[in-house]
């Protein structure tokens, strides 16, 4: 039976992960203030507007101000004010930004190793398994070096709900109905869409409303459900899927390595202390958005919820899962010789985590 990601499971998982890793801080430690430090301003570039996924970054920004008596200004810029969505990585490299939102699928030629976490239909069915996979993979030199080549390092991992699709026109009733459909589908999910006859395209999230409105695309893939509302796609769409769970997208808040090294040690500690609260802020925001969006969509009568049968989903996984994984390995090996090892590690970590969870039930 296919499973969906649970906000509650993520909350529990993150608590366990941080406790085990030593990242979690005690109340006394978290309350430590460093009011005698220097004034520092960091420019953090985010695309789109403030929404559920950015609540984690907002938390870090506020925490930094509170713990330094406003000396450390971790300043967030929305709406591509500082940099286009696909240019944040370049901005970090040249020193124009101290940090920004970076998605591997926006930079496939630059972050090859990170693409393994964008593959469709990986056996990652809930948030705690996702956290274990991210934690394990980001310990690998290949992933660290992928960002390191651009003078960047990962700070906050973006934990996203699985992807669904929202579109205009006649609601699809089977996978056959996706043939010829123009879809915004990123990374490996784009290859999976192609496998069922769709025409995938990659575009930054801020461009999706106009593309759907003008008919450049027929459907848009996004993390369910907050993103559809954040970019107002629910205002111009006629249907959305509920159980495709096509995959996830590997996005992080990347920060400048040189800027990090120049940061006073107490400010570095503050950024690390903020992480558990930042993850909780994201989780809480996802849950709150679902409670608003789903009843609103149902009540509007304008949006048809599309659920596919188990048989249809198994068919989708068969053509859009393992074949896409194998294709990614072959295309990535010239630049990342350990591509197969990375995929094997993802599968091993996820399967062991799933098995461990089942044994505890």
Where do the model's predicted regions map?
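Signature of the catalytic double-stranded beta-helix
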Residues: 129-145
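Proteins with a high burden of low-complexity, intrinsically disordered sequence enriched in S/T/G/P/A and R
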Residues: 8-9, 133-136, 164
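N-terminal secretory/targeting leader peptides
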Residues: 29-129, 145-361
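Bacterial N-terminal signal peptides that target proteins for export
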Residues: 1-12
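C-terminal segment of classical bacterial N-terminal signal peptides
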Residues: 12-27
């Amino acid at each position: 039976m296919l499973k969906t990601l649970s906000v509650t499971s993520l909350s529990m998982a993150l608590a366990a992960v941080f406790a085990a890793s030593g990242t979690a801080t005690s109340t006394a430690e978290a309350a430590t203030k460093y009011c005698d430090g220097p004034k520092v301003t960091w420019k953090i570039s985010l695309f789109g507007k403030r929404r559920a996924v950015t609540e984690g970054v907002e938390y870090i920004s506020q925490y930094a101000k509170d713990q330094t008596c406003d000396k450390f200004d971790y300043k967030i810029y929305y709406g591509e004010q500082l940099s286009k969505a696909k240019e944040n990585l370049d901005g970090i490299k040249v020193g124009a930004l101290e940090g920004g939102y970076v998605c591997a699928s926006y930079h496939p030629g630059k972050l090859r190793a990170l693409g393994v976490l964008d593959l469709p239909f990986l056996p990652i069915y809930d948030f705690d398994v996702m956290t274990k996979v991210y934690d394990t993979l980001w310990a690998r030199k290949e992933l660290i070096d992928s960002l390191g080549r651009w003078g960047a390092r990962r700070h906050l991992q973006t934990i996203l709900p699985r992807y669904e699709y929202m579109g205009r026109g006649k609601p699809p009733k089977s996978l056959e109905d996706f043939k010829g459909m123009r879809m915004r589908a990123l990374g490996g999910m784009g290859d999976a869409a192609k496998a069922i006859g769709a025409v995938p395209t990659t575009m930054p999230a801020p461009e999706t409303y106009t593309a759907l409105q003008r008919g450049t695309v027929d459907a848009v893939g996004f993390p369910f459900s907050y993103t559809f509302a954040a970019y107002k796609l629910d205002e111009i769409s006629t249907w959305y899927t509920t159980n495709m769970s096509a995959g996830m997208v590997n996005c992080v808040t990347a920060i400048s390595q040189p800027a990090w090294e120049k940061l006073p040690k107490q400010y570095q500690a503050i950024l690390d202390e903020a992480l558990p609260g930042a993850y909780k802020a994201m989780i809480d925001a996802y849950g709150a958005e679902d409670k608003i969006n789903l009843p609103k969509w149902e009540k509007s009568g304008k949006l048809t919820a599309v659920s596919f049968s188990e048989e249809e989903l198994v068919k989708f996984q068969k053509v859009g899962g393992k074949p896409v994984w194998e294709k990614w390995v072959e295309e990535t090996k010239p630049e990342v010789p350990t591509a197969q090892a990375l995929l094997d590690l993802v599968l091993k970590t996820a399967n062991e985590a799933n098995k461990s969870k089942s044994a505890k039930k």
